[in-house]
Structure formats: C-alpha cells, structure tokens
Amino acid sequence: MTQSTFGIEEEYFLTDLTSRQVARRNVEAFATACQYELGERVTREMFAAQFEVVTPVLHSLTDARQCLEGARRALARLAREFDCGVLAAGTHPLGQWRRVRATDMPRYRAIFDDYRMVASRSVLAGLHVHVGVAEGVDRIRLMNRLTPWLPLLLGLSASSPFWNGRPSGLMSYRQAVCDEWPRMGIPDHFADEAEYQRYVQVMTDTGCIRSAANLWWNIRPSLRYPTLELRIADACPRLDDALCLAGLFRAMVEHVQLTPHHAWCDDPLTRVLTLENRWRAKRQGLRGLFIEPASQRLLTFATWLEEVLERIAIQVPASDRWILEHARNLALHGGSAEAQLAEYRGARANGLEHGEALHQVVDSLMAQTELHPSQQLA
C-alpha cells in the first residue's frame, strides 16, 4: 500500500505580552499582516485572536515539520511587531471567555446565533489531522474501528488543564467544553457510509444542520476531502508532540485499511467503553487505568499504548520511527498538561502569587510554540 497523504491544522491564540491574556489590541492588524505574508495558509477562527495554520497535502513528517516550523516562526515574528506572542494549547491558561471577542464573519455569526453561550464559551484550540483514504474504502467502517483508540490520542495531546484562569482538575478541559455542544465527542455508530449519508440527509432536510460540516465529532469523514479527520486532540505547544500525533493517526488509518474487520468494533458495548475511556483521558490524561475495548482488561495508559504501537508500527516508515519512542516517553514522563501544572505549582511553591504563576505558565507555552531552543525536547 502506498503511504497515505495527510494534512495538519494547528490552532493558536494571539497573546498580549503585557497582560499575558488572549489579545484584544492589534488583532486585526496582525490578521492583515498574516494574510499578506502567509496567504491562505493562515485562516481566522471563531474568535478574533484565534488563528489556524493549514498545511498543504503532505507526504512525510519531514515535510510537515518544515511547513509547521516555518509557519510558527513566521507567526511569532509577526506577533512581536504588535507586542504579542503565539500560544498553542487546548485552552489559554489566562483565557477569560467573557472578554474574548468573536470574529465578525457570516459563518461565525451563524454559529454564535445558533449555539449562543455554548459557542461563546468555546475559547479552545485543537489539532486536526486529515489522512487520505483509498478510493472505494468505506470511511465509516474505518471510523468505527479507529474510534476506540481515540482516548489514547487525547491522552497524548492533553494540554488544557486550566480554564478561566484557574486549574480545572482535568487534563483536557477543552473536551469538557466540547461536551456542551451537540454532535461533538465520540461519533454515533453507523453501519457504513450509506447509512451515514442517510443520517446527513435527514438532518439537512429537516434544517437541524446546514451541512455535514456541522457534525463536529472527535473523528469524522471530511466533507471536502477523501479523508478521515482526527479532531479529538488538543493543540500541542511542542511541535514534536503534534507531529507524533499526526504520524500515529496516519499509521492507525493505514493499519485498519489493511487488516480484517473485527466484530467487537460494532458491539454497542465498545462505544460505551470508549466513552468511559475518553472521560478517563479527559480527567487523568496519561495516568490512571483504561479499559482495553477488545479484551475488556483494565490497563495502564502506557500498557494499552504499547499494545497499539506494536500493531501499527509496521505502518510507520523508517524516517518516522522516532514517533513510537516519543509516544512512549510522553506516556512515561507526562505531556503538556502535567508540565503546565507542575510549572504552576512550582511557581506557587517559590512564592509567586496565583496570577504571576499563570504568567510563567503562559510564557513557557509561548516559548514552546514559538520554537525557542531551550524549550524543545532533545
């Protein structure tokens, strides 16, 4: 099988360097500068100070690294011209949703009109990965097989332990906010793409949704491209984490295209167990115990991850084998959410006030996002 093409979308918060809050000043000027220098590679999101980088179709993680490194550095340089920085994380540690301005575009006005406070509270940033699916392959049947693994990808990416300027008690509070929306979270089960299309037809014919683009599940078939789109992952401050997740999801998609379908994937119990595992990943990140959905054994995150890595490793090209060890290291040493909380607690233990400690966390996240050398993993 030819290696699948893929694409990555990363979301960032423009951050005021004085207040460390989500920026309110110079946002439109920054957007204009981005448009001039980066063109269609950067798009506006629901909130004025939120931006997304969209890669072209990619063939390797090397290409992805080059593309995203260039984009992150360009955004950081442009942001400094307006006394701002850029920050990638599932939530902004100092983000106050009541203070964040919406983007004044027809598409987003319609969303805010439909979903009201649910939309207004969703000051969130995600990592989305599209992976191409071979022609003639039923994407829904693939989605059914991939869905039980989604909690692993959430745990690896979790980077949103803070909400509204305080620790939330969750490793991915972003997913907690997502649960306020309809048609988010773990997708409903459909037997195949034909059944899924019937559902979309009913929902659009009755005016419940404008199009399949209003199905925001943690994984979904793309409306515009012949891809499956991963949506569960929090935005990653460290580029290596984002690339690792993209490579793992690509390998997972290739694996399920090449191996036989298993009946347990269609068992209603599997979806219920996946919901439980998603909660555990949202709450505990890489810690705690998870229910392996096929055998229903209770496993540590690291043990479950290792079992999945052993299955998909053959799909990872030699140049990308580093992602396997990187994922293991995250499971062993912790990801972004744990690092943010450790930095916050350390700052408080050293005598900093609550707000000052959060400033320190924001500074670290900006340094990681902007690829400052001292913040990159060896």
Swiss-Prot record:
Top EC class per UniProt?
ligase
The catalytic activity, as recorded, is: L-cysteine + L-glutamate + ATP = gamma-L-glutamyl-L-cysteine + ADP + phosphate + H(+)
Q: Name one GO molecular function term.
A: ATP binding
Q: Which UniProt keywords apply?
A: ATP-binding, Ligase, Nucleotide-binding
* Disulfide feature: none
One GO biological process term is:
modified amino acid biosynthetic process
- List, alphabetically, the Pfam families matched: GCS2
EC number in record: 6.3.2.2
Q: What does this protein do?
A: ATP-dependent carboxylate-amine ligase which exhibits weak glutamate--cysteine ligase activity.
Family stated for the protein in its record? Belongs to the glutamate--cysteine ligase type 2 family. YbdK subfamily.
Stated name of the protein: Putative glutamate--cysteine ligase 2
